[in-house]
Swiss-Prot record:
Name of the featured protein: Peptide chain release factor 1
Keywords associated with the record: Cytoplasm, Methylation, Protein biosynthesis
Main location per the UniProt record: cytoplasm
ATP-binding is among the record's keywords: no
Lineage: Bacteria, Pseudomonadati, Pseudomonadota, Betaproteobacteria, Burkholderiales
Family: Belongs to the prokaryotic/mitochondrial release factor family.
Domain of life: Bacteria
Protein function: Peptide chain release factor 1 directs the termination of translation in response to the peptide chain termination codons UAG and UAA.
Keyword set includes Protein biosynthesis: yes
């Protein structure tokens, strides 16, 4: 284990002792708010400190087993026993080190949240809209694999069965943490269904993944800053699908951010969903501005998540998916399009963790 990690972990042991002393004080016990705050920290710090103590004990066990091995060259049974202890301790040490590294990394408070995923057709006309539908299918299939719930919040269908734009809400465990790296430009290379000469075309869609904010964040929006318009919901080609003004469009006047919803059964439900999407977009705007500032200071991690960033290419003739941010290439495009995204998601998460660990080491040496 690297020295800087040992230094960080030693601080957890020290802090645990401080917290145990504070929680034993009568004045703290009488202040319920402070007591709960310190108790929560005690639980988090204790989880790290206990693993660090176990790691140190294993190091001592490993050292003892290695000493035993050196002194038992003439005893095959003792040699075998010592080697088994060495193998077991080494394996558990590596597992614990990986756990401790993950626990030391800075946590994104939004990772555990639900998310909105917006998919917009870009360059490529009808083919781009069809690819937007393929991306929607890919994400919904991935949700099924993860046991998440996905529902369409807003959609603008195209003439050929694709989408000019579609927004889905995904509910489940750590949705945003898994999907946040999907934000950006997705390029597809294939022969479109509308192509009669068999030529490969290139088109693109943009994806934005927004964490669903707390209700408290939504409450902070001043109603006076909102303009709410109602209109008739329509299907593909503008065909009206009902005769009441049930669709809702909400504009946040200070930022110009707009959200609309027409898929609910009533104006009330559409307004509620549109407000949630609007809040998520405002939250994401603030977040992306902070991320851009942080990236300028530390050269960025995986990328800004800006729609203009081309993050990935889907090459159907070669069966290839390439994520340009981490130089990941997989030749299993068809299974990925059926929702088998785990290899991609895990590679991006591992890359972020490695970058964060490097930043942590750099900060420790500063």
């Amino acid at each position: 284990m690297k020295p800087f990690l040992r230094q960080q972990l030693a601080r957890y042991t020290d802090r645990l002792g401080e917290l145990e002393f504070l929680l034993s004080r009568e004045d703290i016990m009488q202040d319920m708010k402070q007591f709960l705050l310190l108790s929560r920290e005690h639980t988090e710090v204790g989880a790290v400190a206990s693993r660090w103590a176990r790691y140190q004990q294993l190091e001592a066990d490993l050292s003892g087993a290695q000493e035993l091995l050196r002194g038992s060259v003439d005893d095959p049974d003792m040699t075998a026993m010592a080697q088994e202890e060495i193998d077991n301790a080494s394996a558990e040490l590596q597992k614990l080190e990986n756990e401790l590294q993950r626990m030391l990394l800075p946590k994104d408070p939004d990772d555990a949240r639900n998310a909105f995923v917006e998919i917009r057709a870009g360059t490529g006309g009808d083919e781009s809209a069809l690819f937007a539908a393929d991306l929607l299918r890919m994400y919904t299939r991935y949700c099924e694999r993860r046991g998440w719930k996905a529902e369409i919040i807003s959609e603008s269908p195209s003439e050929l069965g694709g989408y000019k734009e579609v927004v889905i809400k995904i509910e489940g465990d750590h949705v945003y943490g898994a999907l946040k790296f999907e934000s950006g430009g997705h390029r597809v290379q294939r022969v479109p269904v509308t192509e009669t000469q068999g030529r490969i075309h290139t088109s693109a869609c943009t994806v934005a993944v927004l964490a669903e904010p707390d209700e408290a964040v939504a409450i902070q929006i001043n109603p006076a800053d909102l303009r709410i318009d109602t209109y008739r919901a329509s299907g593909a080609g503008g065909q009206h699908i009902n005769k009441t003004d049930s669709a809702v469009r909400i504009t946040h006047l200070p930022t110009g951010i707009v959200a609309e919803c027409q898929d609910g059964r009533s104006q009330h439900s559409n307004k509620a969903q549109a407000l949630k999407v609007l809040t998520a977009r405002i939250h994401e705007k603030d977040r992306s501005e902070r991320a851009a500032k942080d990236a300028a200071e530390r050269k960025g991690l995986i990328g800004s998540g800006d729609r203009s960033d081309r993050i990935r290419t889907y090459n159907f003739p070669q069966g290839r998916l390439t994520d340009h941010r981490i130089n990941l290439t997989l030749y299993k495009l068809l299974t990925i399009m059926e929702g088998d995204l785990d290899d991609v998601v895990q590679a991006l998460q591992a890359f972020e963790a490695a970058q964060q660990l490097a930043a942590l080491e750099l900060g420790a040496g500063a």
